[in-house]
UniProtKB/Swiss-Prot annotation:
Residues 5-78 form the PAS domain. The phosphatase and kinase activities are regulated by the nitrogen regulatory proteins P-II 1 (GlnB) and P-II 2 (GlnK). GlnB acts by binding to NtrB, leading to activation of the phosphatase activity and inhibition of the kinase activity. Binding of GlnB to NtrB is allosterically controlled by the small-molecule effector 2-ketoglutarate. At low 2-ketoglutarate concentrations, GlnB interacts with NtrB, but not at high 2-ketoglutarate concentrations. Uridylylation of GlnB also prevents interaction with NtrB. This is Sensory histidine kinase/phosphatase NtrB. The C-terminal ATP-binding domain is required for both kinase and phosphatase activities and contains the GlnB binding site. The keyword Transit peptide does not apply. The gene is glnL. Its EC number is 2.7.13.3, 3.1.3.-. Autophosphorylated. One of its GO terms (molecular function) is phosphorelay sensor kinase activity.
């Protein structure tokens, strides 16, 4: 009776579509299957003996936590790890386990697109719920503010002692400040006037406005796609969105300065708010600042969340609201030395 030849472990690993690495406790690579070589853009010979972090611009894996789990005799899994190599970002699911010979087997699988889309939709729903809650509170605050201000005005007219007017003035000024904050929290409630024209007109207005604020050590670079089709949009609202993002980039660079790139591209076959579009406009704002702190990234679009001292945390929340009204989306990637916001606006189905 004929028996089939059993494949060895090397053949199995070489045939896997997931990236497999064998690393030691110093994270030096001892084996990389073909999928891992393709991911890391290096041959097996060049990878051998090289510590994994040296090959990457950024790797969000919590290596200390992984090593603690392995030392405790447990496996380790992180379902959303960002890996950046040669300027390309990959979202991976990473699993690690200790082998009998003491080596660490690291398996890296691309995050399933459907699962990633579901996570994005859930996160967006949570952000919308948070925004609606803040708006409800803002409405409740705004109503008594009007009464407070009106009462202070009447009181200022009735006070016999002019020296007391200073107190009513403070009340009125603070009521106005709170009302302005509430108006910003509420944001635009209705779609504005749409026109069909090149998005580059808005981009150029933003460049003109921001150029007046640029210090000498910051470069603003334009990288436009001249073939980008015209699209229907509210120029004032899109200008506000891009201004918020570009100014955030400028503030993130700080006194050290750096570079901001305003880029436009055509995106193809994109799903936005459950609708499939053959064409969409992509507007990127990229900077080489310190990056967004990891603890802020999941809640960055929530109202009142800011990584900047003195910031209100409203700019990105309002920006997402405006882009939602255009049936578009905003997403970002960030690691030390790189942050990129991408705005997608539909052109045609």
């Amino acid at each position: 009776m004929a028996t089939g030849t059993q494949p060895d472990a090397g053949q199995i690993l070489n045939s896997l579509i997931n990236s497999i690495l064998l690393i030691d406790d110093n994270l030096a690579i001892h084996y990389a299957n073909p999928a891992a070589q393709q991911l890391l853009a290096q041959s097996s010979r060049k990878l051998f003996g090289t510590p994994l972090p040296e090959l990457l611009s950024y790797f969000s894996l919590n290596i200390e936590l992984m090593q603690e789990s392995l030392e405790a005799g447990q496996g380790f899994t992180d379902n959303e790890v960002t890996l950046v190599i040669d300027g390309r970002s990959h979202i991976l699911s990473v699993t690690a386990q200790r082998m009998p010979d003491g080596m660490i087997l690291l398996e890296m699988a691309p995050m399933d697109n459907q699962r990633r889309l579901s996570q994005e939709q859930l996160q967006h729903a949570q952000q919308v719920a948070a925004r609606d809650l803040v708006r409800g509170l803002a409405h409740e605050i705004k109503n008594p503010l009007g009464g407070l201000r009106g009462a202070a005005q009447l009181l200022s007219k009735a006070l016999p002692d002019p020296s007391l007017l200073e107190y009513t003035k403070v009340i009125i000024e603070q009521a106005d400040r709170l009302r302005n904050l509430v108006d910003r929290l509420l944001g635009p409630q209705l779609p504005g006037t749409r026109v069909t024209e090149s998005i580059h007109k808005v981009a150029e207005r933003v460049v003109t406005l921001v150029s007046m604020e640029l210090p000498d050590n910051v470069r603003l670079i334009r990288d436009y796609d001249p073939s980008l089709p015209e699209l229907a949009h509210d120029p004032d609202q899109i200008e506000q969105v891009l201004l918020n993002i570009v100014r955030n980039a400028l503030q993130a660079l700080g006194p050290e300065g750096g570079e901001i790139i305003l880029r436009t591209r055509t995106a193809f076959q994109l799903t936005l708010h459950g609708e499939r579009y053959r064409l969409a406009a992509r507007i990127d704002v990229e900077d080489n600042g310190p990056g967004i702190p990891p603890h802020l990234q999941d809640t960055l679009f929530y109202p009142m969340v800011s990584g900047r001292e003195g910031g209100t945390g409203l700019g990105l929340s309002i920006a997402r609201n405006l882009i939602d009204q255009h049936s578009g989306k905003i997403e970002f990637t960030s690691w030390p030395g790189h942050t990129e916001f991408s705005v997608y606006l539909p052109i045609r189905k």
